[in-house]
């Protein structure tokens, strides 16, 4: 058995297990961990089922989520795997973006086929922009009738297609997490096949650095004799000195040129994703720009006021509201670095939303914000967070 060596140059991919609560997500996660440890002991740590199953509570923006993080490697990639055991935990994790996924393994028990939660998870995966799903048909050892397995597979493929995933071509791998954990060679191989499918079919994520430049403005000040400087943390992309940029959001779009880039009082030729920097803007007055706008590569993002969103409303215990709200509720929506007031319209058939619920809603902001599908936001009242959501569709 050739030892694969640890290479930092391997692509890093975030994946997760999703699906109905009793279909064996956690068992499969433990099986993947064990099978890869046995196959590549130099690359992987030994993890037992109990350590994954006792998903620790995490606080993400004040929201309590039970979630397990497991790391493992194949020869080709390094994976960070999230497993949210409870249905509510999964929903919260997806909506709040606590753990972004580059792809997900939809776990469906061959004994049951897709259930209501399976459908809800697939819908949510599409809404929050999980780019790729593949399927683990778990508990396949318990179904002796091949035709029945084929039928369940067909049903799952139809479900994927109905939510705009590639149901025709997505890998569907028949596995048994439990048997693989017990070391049964046939089912150990099934988990190896599953991970090979993950390696081959989940596309390499586009790194933040390779996306078009975007920096939310946190602060604006004037340097006498030089002009206006905006500061913030570059969210994505790279920006070279003397590049043209646009300032988007809140006011009409302005075009300008970045004539200086500074970090920790040092002059730079380039700003990179993840760095805190100051950008000197040509011909822009201090009062022309404000916190909450973004500096971007021209044409890469547009300002919008009206959108559909999927939102989780904090429970009272999480420090949220104590009572429900209705349509026409007007809280603040905190995007990146600023609050903008917006009016909520609830979907037909939803009269009110209780603390602890998740819901879809339509929002009309009073000022435009640089927006794209999947953008996260917090809902706030008087400075405290009462909800967390993501843009699922831009209306105007």
Curated annotation (Swiss-Prot):
Location of this chain's protein in the cell: Cytoplasm
Region (G1): 19-26
Region called G3, residue ranges: 83-86
Binding site residues for Mg(2+): 26
Catalytic activity from the UniProt record: GTP + H2O = GDP + phosphate + H(+)
GO cellular component, one term: cytosol
UniProt-annotated stretches for the region G5: 176-178
Keywords: Cytoplasm, Elongation factor, GTP-binding, Hydrolase, Magnesium, Metal-binding, Nucleotide-binding, Protein biosynthesis
EC number: 3.6.5.3
Location, primary (coarse class): cytoplasm
Transmembrane segments: none
A matching Pfam family: GTP_EFTU
Entry superkingdom: Bacteria
Domain tr-type G: 10-206
GO molecular function: GTP binding; GTPase activity; translation elongation factor activity
Sites where the protein binds GTP: 19-26, 83-87, 138-141
G4: annotated segments: 138-141
Coiled-coil residue spans: none
Region (G2): 62-66
Entry similarity comment: Belongs to the TRAFAC class translation factor GTPase superfamily. Classic translation factor GTPase family. EF-Tu/EF-1A subfamily.
Oligomeric form and interacting partners: Monomer.
Cited function: GTP hydrolase that promotes the GTP-dependent binding of aminoacyl-tRNA to the A-site of ribosomes during protein biosynthesis.
Stated name of the protein: Elongation factor Tu
């Amino acid at each position: 058995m050739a030892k694969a060596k640890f290479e930092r140059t391997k692509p890093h991919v975030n994946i997760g297990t999703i699906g109905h609560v009793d279909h064996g997500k956690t068992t499969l996660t433990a099986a993947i961990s064990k099978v890869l440890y046995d196959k590549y002991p130099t690359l992987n740590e030994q993890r037992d089922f109990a350590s994954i199953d006792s998903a620790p509570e995490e606080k993400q923006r004040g929201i309590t989520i039970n979630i397990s993080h497991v790391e493992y490697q194949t020869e080709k990639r390094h994976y960070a795997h999230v497993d949210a055991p409870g249905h509510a935990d999964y929903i919260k994790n997806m909506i709040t973006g606590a753990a972004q996924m580059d792809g997900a393994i939809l776990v469906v028990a061959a004994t049951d086929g897709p259930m209501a939660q399976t459908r809800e998870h697939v819908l949510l995966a599409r809404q929050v922009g999980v780019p790729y799903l593949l399927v683990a048909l778990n508990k396949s050892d318990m179904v002796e009738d091949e035709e029945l397995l084929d039928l369940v597979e067909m049903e799952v493929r139809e479900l994927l297609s109905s939510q705009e995933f590639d149901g025709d071509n997505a890998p569907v791998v028949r596995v048994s997490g439990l048997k693989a954990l017990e070391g049964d060679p046939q089912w150990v191989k099934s988990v190896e096949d599953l991970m090979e499918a993950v390696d081959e079919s989940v596309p390499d994520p586009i790194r933040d650095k390779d996306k078009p430049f975007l920096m939310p403005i946190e602060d604006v000040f004037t340097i006498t004799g030089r002009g206006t400087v905006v500061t913030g943390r570059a969210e994505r992309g790279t920006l070279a000195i003397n590049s043209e940029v646009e300032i988007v959001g809140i006011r009409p779009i302005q075009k300008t040129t970045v004539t200086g880039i500074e970090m920790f009082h040092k002059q730079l030729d380039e700003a990179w994703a993840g760095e805190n920097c100051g950008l000197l803007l040509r011909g822009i007055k201090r009062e022309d720009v404000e916190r909450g706008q973004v500096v971007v590569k021209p044409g890469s993002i547009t300002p919008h006021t009206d959108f559909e969103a999927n939102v989780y409303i904090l429970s009272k215990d999480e420090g949220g509201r104590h009572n429900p709200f209705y349509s026409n509720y007007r809280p603040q929506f905190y995007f990146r670095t600023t609050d903008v007031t917006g009016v909520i319209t609830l979907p037909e058939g939803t009269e009110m939303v209780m603390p602890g619920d998740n819901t879809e809603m339509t929002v009309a902001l009073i000022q435009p914000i640089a927006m794209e599908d999947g953008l996260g936001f917090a809902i706030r009242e008087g400075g405290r967070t009462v909800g967390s959501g993501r843009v699922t569709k831009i209306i105007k």
